[in-house]
C-alpha cells in the first residue's frame, strides 16, 4: 500500500498472506471469510501455495500464527457475458479449519452493495514504493474512495474495459495513496463491509487520476455461498 501507515495489529485479523511454497516468496494477500475458506484474486494462483493466518510482522515467527495449504481452489468460470476482468477471483478451501484467536477472525461477506462515494480501507504487505519495489515486514493500511466505474474506464483506455462489469473502481484522484504490487488479493472494506478484492491497476501505482480496479464481492455472493455450501451446481449470475 502506497501512502498508508502500518496497520493496527488488531484491525486485520482476517487478512492472510499467500506465499509460493518452494521459494517462500510472498505473493499476495487474501481474506478469511470463515474458518475454512479464503477469498483472494485468481491472478495470485500458483501450483504450490502456503497460507499464513494471524500474521502481522512477516519477518518474525509469531507464536499464534497458523499455516495452511489449499485443499481445493475454485475459479469463477462462468462463460456468458463475462470478461477476464470479471474473473479475477479465487476461493480457497483450507486443508483444515483455522482456530480463531485475538489475531484470527473472519470478515463477513457484504450484506448490501457498495455505495459510490464511500470511504474504503485497504491493507496489505504490498510495496510501499513505486515503481521500485520495497516490501514492508508489516501490513500497511490506507483509506481510499469508492469512485464511479466510468472514472476507471476513462483513466485506463488501454484496458478497453467493458461498459458493464462486476468490478469496482477505487482510489484517490489526487494521487499518492493506492494499493500496489503484492497487495493483490487483499480486501477493500467500505463502510465496514468487505466489498472488493485488490485486482489490477496502472503499472506505477498512486498516480493522479489513475484509480485501481477491485473485483466486486457483492456480485459474486451466490457463487461463493453455493461453493461453500457444497452445492453441485454453481449458478452463474445472469
Swiss-Prot record:
Task: Tell me the PROSITE patterns matching this sequence.
Answer: TRYPSIN_DOM, TRYPSIN_HIS
One GO cellular component term, please give it: extracellular space
Q: What outcome is documented for mutating residue 43 to R in this protein?
A: No change in inhibition potency of Kv10.1/KCNH1/EAG1
Output the Gene Ontology terms for molecular function.
potassium channel regulator activity; serine-type endopeptidase activity; toxin activity
User: Top EC class per UniProt?
Assistant: hydrolase
The Gene Ontology biological process terms listed for this entry are: proteolysis
Tissue distribution is: Expressed by the venom gland.
- Which Gene3D superfamilies does this one have? Trypsin-like serine proteases (2.40.10.10)
InterPro entries per the record? Peptidase_S1_PA, Peptidase_S1_PA_chymotrypsin, Peptidase_S1A, Serine_Proteases_S1, Trypsin_dom, TRYPSIN_HIS
Q: The Peptidase S1 domain covers which part of the protein?
A: 1-229
Enzyme Commission number, as recorded:
3.4.21.-
Localization recorded for this chain is: Secreted
Q: Where is the active site?
A: 43, 88, 184
> What pH-dependence text does the entry carry?
Activity is stable from pH 3.5 and 10.5.
Annotated site, Pharmacophore that directly interacts to Kv10.1/KCNH1/EAG1 channel selectivity filter, chain positions: 79
Q: How does activity depend on temperature?
A: Thermostable. Activity is stable after incubation at 100 degrees Celsius for 30 minutes.
Activity regulation, per record: Inhibited by Cu(2+) and, to a lesser extent, by Zn(2+) and Ba(2+). Not inhibited by Ca(2+) and Mg(2+).
Protein keywords: Blood coagulation cascade activating toxin, Disulfide bond, Hemostasis impairing toxin, Hydrolase, Ion channel impairing toxin, Potassium channel impairing toxin, Protease, Secreted, Serine protease, Toxin, Voltage-gated potassium channel impairing toxin
> Function of this protein?
Thrombin-like snake venom serine protease. Releases fibrinopeptide A and B in the conversion of fibrinogen to fibrin, with preferential activity on the alpha chain of fibrinogen. When tested in vitro, the recombinant protein does not degrade blood clots, suggesting that this toxin lacks fibrinolytic activity.
Known partners and oligomeric status: Monomer.
Remarks, anything else? Answer: Negative results: recombinant protein has no activity on many tested channels (Shaker IR, Kv1.4/KCNA4, Kv2.1/KCNB1, hKv11.1/KCNH2/ERG1, rNav1.1/SCN1A, rNav1.2/SCN2A, rNav1.3/SCN3A, rNav1.4/SCN4A, hNav1.5/SCN5A, mNav1.6/SCN8A, hNav1.8/SCN10A). PEGylation of both native and recombinant forms increases 5-6-fold hERG1 inhibition (IC(50)=22.4 uM for PEG-collinein-1 and IC(50)=10.0 uM for PEGrCollinein-1). In contrast, PEGylated proteins displays a great loss in the capability of inhibiting Kv10.1/KCNH1/EAG1, compared to their non-PEGylated counterparts.
Family, as annotated:
Belongs to the peptidase S1 family. Snake venom subfamily.
Q: Which PANTHER family match?
A: RIKEN CDNA 2210010C04 GENE, TRYPSIN-RELATED
This one is known as Thrombin-like enzyme collinein-1
List the source organism: Crotalus durissus collilineatus
